[in-house]
């Protein structure tokens, strides 16, 4: 019943997935956009507070952007935000070999997936069959194929790369908010008139 239950247990999960609001600029000299990272953190806290079933907790973090709501006019913002786990992977831009850079990024995602979801060091199989766990290089590259099919958009680096932002509200919700805003603006104009009338007396 404590409002801090989700915060306490989310801390453990966020440590496992290496959550951070900022990066060490000595290690990563390029600017990174972490302004929205809090959304993922808050989603994890909320998931623990709501006792979200574990299968849904994992599925939304891996493929939340592919989960379609029943109503096509709605947006499943919660599932979009949950994919933040993949966005906070260790991405170091600037490697002269672009293919190597992407392969390293995919390796980091596979390592995260293996450690967080399976409790295994799957990334070892990038170079050789795992010495202790039943993970072969074939298994590794089967997983890697899934992550290689993902288009990487790292966000703005020194203002040169466009950041793709996904809407978290549907058009209907945006229209509703805009209607309330316009109503409130009209009411504000009326109140200012009344204030001016009283002030002139």
Where are these regions (language model features)?
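Short, structured secondary-structure elements
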Residues: 1-172
């Amino acid at each position: 019943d404590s409002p801090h239950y989700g915060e306490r247990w989310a801390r453990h999960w966020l440590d496992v997935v290496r959550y951070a609001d900022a990066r060490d600029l000595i290690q990563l000299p390029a600017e990174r956009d972490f302004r929205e990272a809090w959304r993922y953190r808050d989603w994890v806290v909320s998931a623990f507070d709501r006792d979200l079933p574990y299968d849904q907790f994992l599925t939304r973090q891996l493929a939340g952007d592919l989960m379609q709501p029943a109503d096509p006019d709605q947006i499943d913002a919660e599932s979009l935000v949950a994919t933040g786990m993949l966005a906070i992977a260790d991405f170091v831009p600037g490697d002269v070999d672009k293919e190597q850079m992407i392969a390293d990024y995919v390796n980091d995602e596979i390592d995260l997936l293996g450690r967080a979801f399976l409790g295994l060091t799957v990334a070892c199989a990038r170079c050789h069959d795992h010495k202790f766990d039943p993970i072969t290089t074939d298994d590794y590259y089967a997983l890697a194929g899934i992550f290689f099919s993902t288009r990487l958009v790292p966000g703005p680096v020194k203002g040169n790369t466009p950041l793709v932002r996904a809407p978290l509200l549907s058009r209907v919700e945006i229209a509703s908010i805009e209607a309330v805003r316009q109503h409130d603006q009209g009411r504000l104009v009326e109140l200012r008139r009344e204030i001016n009338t009283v002030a002139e007396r």
